[in-house]
A protein has these predicted regions:
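Nucleotide-activated sugar donor-binding and catalytic core shared by glycosyltransferases
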Residues: 1-197, 201-322
Length: 322
């Protein structure tokens, strides 16, 4: 969770954690429970259908803004920072009502509509990717992603029997799950260990093999990253964390719905920079797995380093609150 990693950096700079308030939903709360900060849980309305969703549910939007403003108005808020495009319009309005500076972190190559609209109010937009599109370029500062720095490349060790991690994002991926099923039926699977994050509410695969373990969801990604040598997954904003750790990725970008704009562009960026490979078929997947595996054995698996934004973003926010 980017905000958790950012809070840790702010604390290192000298920020009193009691001066930080996080507005989140139930899903985000569980990631922040071990931090000594104020957390306000809300079911604030956020549109997943663009501007139309906000227009059709305008009363819900107003209620959410009033609710959050009521909680924050006596807390002397000087900075509002958001990492989520869906909630960005509410955060933008709240910043105006509280007379606070507003910052956005854009986690994809192609900015979502929520961040694009909210950028009108933002002082700055911190981008994870270079050349971020669909947003006010004059306000964009390329910082790199916010990642978990408790792990570094030195902590990612090559296993005697290489391990492939399959993950389809927080909600899982039917396509990736299907590829796992096919892979476990192939002769190739015996050469690897498999860690599969199937996603909640996804159909569990009936795989009985000593080299296969499956999870609905993983809360501590550190454990997952330390287990794997190759990552097969989507191309969301989190793919930059694997790049930071030097884990080669096989990318299967989602091409439908709200992620259809940014995931293919994210994947192309990662491939162009040498952090991963895009595949479109199961056959392509097996070819790339073999290529990467042979690269490990020949010592040709070093990935280029990636710039991260933890410190740069934290310093900018810290300067505004001291």
């Amino acid at each position: 969770l980017p905000v958790k990693n950012l809070i840790k950096e702010l604390e290192k700079l000298g920020t009193n954690l009691h001066d930080i308030v996080v507005v989140s939903d139930d899903r985000g709360q569980k990631y922040l429970e071990n931090l000594n900060i104020n957390i306000y849980i809300t079911k604030a309305y956020s549109s997943q259908n663009g501007i139309l969703g906000y227009l059709l549910n305008f009363p819900k939007l107003i209620r959410s803004i009033k609710e959050i403003r009521k909680f924050l108005r006596n807390k002397n808020i000087s900075v509002v920072f958001t990492t989520g495009a869906y909630i960005a319009p509410i955060a933008a309005v709240i910043s105006v009502l509280l007379n606070a500076k507003f910052y956005i972190q854009e986690q994809n190559v192609y900015a979502g509509l929520g961040n694009k609209v909210s950028a009108i109010i933002a002082k700055s937009i911190f981008s994870s990717f270079e050349d971020t599109k669909n947003i006010n370029e004059k306000k964009v500062i390329h910082t790199g992603p916010i990642v978990n720095t408790s792990l570094t490349r030195k902590d990612i060790l090559l296993h005697e029997k290489q391990t492939i991690g399959f993950i389809g994002g927080s909600q899982g991926s039917e396509q990736i799950n299907q590829y796992v099923d096919e892979f476990m039926k192939s002769e190739l699977h015996t050469d690897f260990n498999i860690v599969h994050v199937a996603g909640k509410n996804k159909t569990n695969l009936e795989i009985d093999s000593n080299n296969y373990e499956s999870f609905d969801f993983i809360e501590e990604m550190d454990d997952f990253y330390k287990k794997i040598d190759i990552l097969v997954g989507r191309a969301g904003g989190g793919s930059l964390e694997a790049a930071y750790l030097g884990i080669p990725q096989i990318l299967i970008p989602y091409k439908y719905g709200t992620t259809s704009s940014h995931q293919p562009l994210n994947a192309k960026y990662l491939e162009d920079k040498g952090y991963g490979f895009i595949v479109n078929t199961f056959e392509d997947l097996t070819i790339k797995i073999n290529e990467i595996s042979k690269g490990f054995k020949s010592g040709k698996s070093n990935l280029p380093n990636i710039t991260i934004g933890n410190l740069m973003i934290s310093k900018e926010l810290y300067e505004q609150i001291v």
